[in-house]
Regions:
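Basic, glycine-/proline-tolerant helical and adjacent loop/strand elements
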Residues: 2-83
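Hydrophobic transmembrane signal anchors and adjacent membrane-proximal interface regions, especially
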Residues: 8-13, 48, 52-59, 91, ...
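Alpha-helical protein-protein interaction elements
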Residues: 62-63, 68, 81-84, 95, ...
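C-terminal, charged low-complexity interaction regions
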Residues: 105-166
């Protein structure tokens, strides 16, 4: 009886894309970092290098005030009350040039003992508190790189932003 009462439920949802029901928590992923869209389409071929896991955005050729921005794609897990699996956000976290290069160098290896810090630009549905025209919130986080073949996981530093609270 106690097992039935206290067992966590498996989440079930209907996929909008395939119209099928899936068991397990849903996830949502950002295909590109938000700043990708700040680069005009006509300049993206020259200024943006990316794949499914990495992104580097360089400043305009004559811009000496900006540095390149380095991103790695990570997983941010949000627990769902009463569910056995978390909701997962696929997010892009900024990295220093040194950490970005180290991540690339060790990409094909087990990175379980590796970690770095970075920033999450909060442009996620339900969590973006910025008004139109205001800058987006940046949340500091720790990136746990993880086993070979798995995306790194992110833990946000403690703060009062709702995403960190969740």
């Amino acid at each position: 009886m106690f097992e039935r009462l206290f067992r966590k439920k498996r989440f079930k949802y209907k996929c909008d894309e395939c119209q099928e029901y899936h068991v397990g928590s849903p996830s949502f992923s950002m295909k590109h970092p938000t700043s990708f869209f700040d680069v005009p389409e006509t300049e993206r071929n020259d200024r943006v290098q990316y794949n499914d896991d990495l992104c580097m955005i360089t400043p305009r050729e004559n811009d000496t005030t900006e540095d390149p921005i380095y991103y790695i794609r990570c997983i941010l897990e949000i627990p769902i009350k009463g569910a056995s699996e978390p909701f997962m956000w696929g997010v892009w976290i900024t990295q220093s040039k040194e950490n970005f290069e180290r991540y690339i160098e060790t990409f094909e290896a087990n990175q379980s003992n590796e970690k770095s810090s970075g920033w999450l630009l909060v442009d996620l549905p339900f969590y973006n508190n910025a008004r139109t025209g205001e800058p987006l919130t940046h949340l500091e986080c720790e990136v746990h790189w993880g086993p070979k073949g798995q995306r790194p996981k992110v833990s946000l530093w403690e703060n009062s932003h709702q995403l960190a609270v969740d």
